[in-house]
């Protein structure tokens, strides 16, 4: 059903890449009570739950008409249904975290010295209206790409995936609804009347497109290709998972007319927080699975990528072939093989590094509840 070359094994292992990759940031399965408390406390600081930040657009007449057609997909296996269901589980899965981070940073930074007194009077709960609009725009862009990621590659369609016409119809709805959300985001972006912010968010959209291209390009059998075409894992992860948040954080500082240093620190916080949480999400199958338990994991997950680099391409190919042909190595043994090498520990170390870098970046902001919430969020991605 999803675009994964090769055997049924590689399709099974890569389903999280094709079907759930858009949910990987701030929606991993580790949604513990600790993480939920961190998010809940942070939402109280910004004034309202960000789980419904894009609800205004989602409930518009135009998208309501699209939703009526999407209902026809009920009973099919098209991934757009799972995406739609995700909208009502936002408060549980923390899907709308980007907007929350933008609002927290805006509140933590406060008004700049360059801001006029008239502009300062427009602040609500320490946040400018334009910054709240930016947070909504950020969520709309993320949601649009999340919907687009659910488009099925019909070249890999099989009878077991259900009727072909259902997949074709679902793809049309995914393209239409994703484009609608993106168009609304771009309209809102223009209404901010700040060319630098438009440039920043536009470049983030370009980064997302490039990152998704890399994700689609990589060869499942080879892990991440031969290393000459694709960027290193960190660069690729930043494009598809971190650029939007990092540049939105920087744009929030620009809207409040903060200096370049404040913008740089906000960018760094968003960047390192994104990468830290991506690593945390990738690590979940390897730190939570019990001995002998078969857990679905992605071949593009950081521990697997690092494992492949450690053991070498030839041995990695051999391990995949043994699983594919049902030889001595089973799926659970492949998971154990990855866990036995230093790939997992390397990913854990890198996760801690990015968590610490995010904490360092936020220290320059004035001490406040908002800054404490940002510190708690950065620390939470370092817990497994």
List where the protein language model places each region.
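Short, contiguous, pocket-lining structural segments
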Residues: 93, 173, 177, 193, ...
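Solvent-exposed loop and edge beta-strand segments that line ligand/cofactor-binding
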Residues: 34-41, 88-95, 169-174, 237, ...
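Transmembrane helix-loop-helix
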Residues: 186-203, 313, 320-321
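Hydrophobic packing residues in well-ordered alpha-helices of helical domains and bundles
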Residues: 59, 63, 131-134, 198-201, ...
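Acidic, Mg2+-coordinating active-site segments of isoprenoid diphosphate-utilizing enzymes
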Residues: 25-35, 104-120, 146-168, 186, ...
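C-terminal charged capping/lid subdomain of soluble metabolic enzymes
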Residues: 333-384
């Amino acid at each position: 059903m999803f675009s994964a070359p090769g055997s049924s094994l590689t399709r099974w292992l890569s389903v999280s890449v094709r079907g759930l990759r858009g949910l990987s940031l701030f929606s991993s399965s580790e949604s513990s009570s600790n993480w939920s408390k961190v998010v809940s406390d942070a939402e109280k600081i910004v004034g309202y739950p960000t789980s419904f930040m894009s609800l205004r657009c989602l409930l518009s007449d135009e998208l309501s008409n699209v939703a009526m057609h999407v209902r026809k997909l009920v009973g099919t296996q098209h991934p757009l249904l799972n995406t739609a269901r995700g909208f009502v589980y936002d408060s549980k899965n923390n899907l709308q975290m980007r907007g929350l981070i933008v609002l927290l940073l805006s509140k933590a930074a406060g008004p700049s010295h360059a801001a006029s007194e008239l502009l300062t009077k427009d602040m609500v709960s320490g946040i400018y209206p334009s910054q709240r609009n930016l947070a909504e725009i950020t969520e709309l862009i993320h949601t649009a790409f999340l919907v687009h990621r659910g488009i099925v590659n019909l070249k890999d369609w099989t009878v077991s995936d259900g009727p072909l016409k259902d997949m074709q119809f679902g793809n049309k709805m995914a393209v239409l609804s994703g484009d609608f959300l993106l168009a609304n985001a771009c309209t809102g972006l223009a209404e901010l009347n700040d060319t630098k912010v438009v440039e920043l968010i536009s470049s983030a959209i370009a980064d997302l497109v490039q990152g998704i291209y890399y994700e689609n390009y990589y060869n499942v059998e080879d892990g991440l290709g031969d290393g000459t075409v694709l960027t290193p894992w960190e660069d690729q992860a930043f494009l598809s998972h971190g650029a939007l948040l990092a540049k939105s954080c920087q744009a929030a500082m620009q809207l409040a007319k903060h200096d370049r240093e404040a913008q740089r620190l906000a960018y760094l916080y968003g960047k390192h927080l994104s990468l830290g949480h991506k690593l945390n999400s990738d690590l979940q199958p390897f730190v939570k699975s019990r001995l002998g338990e078969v857990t679905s994991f992605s071949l593009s997950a950081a521990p697997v990528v690092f494992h492949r680099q450690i053991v070498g391409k030839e041995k990695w190919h051999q391990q995949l072939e043994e699983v594919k042909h049902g030889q001595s190595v089973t799926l659970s043994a492949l998971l154990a093989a990855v866990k036995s090498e230093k790939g997992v520990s390397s990913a854990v170390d890198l996760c801690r590094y990015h968590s610490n870098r995010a904490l360092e970046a936020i220290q320059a902001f004035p001490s406040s509840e908002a800054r404490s919430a940002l510190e708690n969020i950065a620390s939470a991605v370092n817990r497994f």
